[in-house]
Amino acid sequence: MPGTAEVQVRPGVEEDLKPLTDLYNHYVRETPITFDTEPFTPEERRPWLLSHPEDGPYRLRVATDAESQEILGYATSSPYRAKPAYATSVETTVYVAPGAGGRGIGSLLYASLFDALAAEDLHRAYAGIAQPNEASARLHARFGFRHVGTYREVGRKFGRYWDVAWYERPL
């Protein structure tokens, strides 16, 4: 697995659909990090991909191995809520491929994402982190997020309830 010097971060494109779906499905099947409980097909994920264009407030940034072009992770900004008054708020997520953790991929992705969002008319970014997840909490703290509350036992997956800690960051 490459170090961060051999990683490129770029906007997500249509050709990324299958590997991004495979990466996400790992988290669906194996972890409580996402509260989706059934894996997706690439076609089911296509609307998600298309909802993150190259510009605007809702972005998809993809980290790839510079040589092999293997996807190492991705970060998104998505609508926080559907109602119009929330339009200047986004929810951010970051997913790192199994085996690529601990190499700074998440930091590269978030740096790229927040650089891309700097020119947008946005006020706040929010991130929900299923607990426990110390690595994600540290990543978010490094990028200026602060813990604002925890929803207790808000989701049920794998036969148990999970808390979600919420973090916010000014943009």
Curated annotation (Swiss-Prot):
Please list the residues that bind acetyl-CoA: V94, Y95, V96, G102, R103, G104, I105, G106, S107, N133
User: What is the main EC category here?
Assistant: transferase
Q: Which UniProt keywords apply?
A: Acyltransferase, Antibiotic resistance, Herbicide resistance, Transferase
**What is catalysed by this protein?**
phosphinothricin + acetyl-CoA = N-acetylphosphinothricin + CoA + H(+)
Instruction: Report the residue ranges that make up the N-acetyltransferase domain in this protein.
Output: 7-171
Q: Name one GO biological process term.
A: response to herbicide
Q: Which InterPro entries match?
A: Acyl_CoA_acyltransferase (IPR016181), GNAT_dom (IPR000182)
Is Acyltransferase given among the entry's keywords?
yes
Q: What is its EC number?
A: 2.3.1.183
Per its record, what are the GO molecular function terms? phosphinothricin N-acetyltransferase activity
Out of the domains of life, which is the source?
Answer: Bacteria
Which family is this protein grouped under?
A: Belongs to the acetyltransferase family. PAT/BAR subfamily.
PANTHER family on file: N-ACETYLTRANSFERASE, UPF0039 PROTEIN C11D3.02C
In UniProt terms, what function does this protein have? Inactivates phosphinothricin (PPT) by transfer of an acetyl group from acetyl CoA. The physiological substrate could be a structurally related compound.
Q: What is this protein called?
A: Phosphinothricin N-acetyltransferase
Organism equals: Streptomyces coelicolor (strain ATCC BAA-471 / A3(2) / M145)
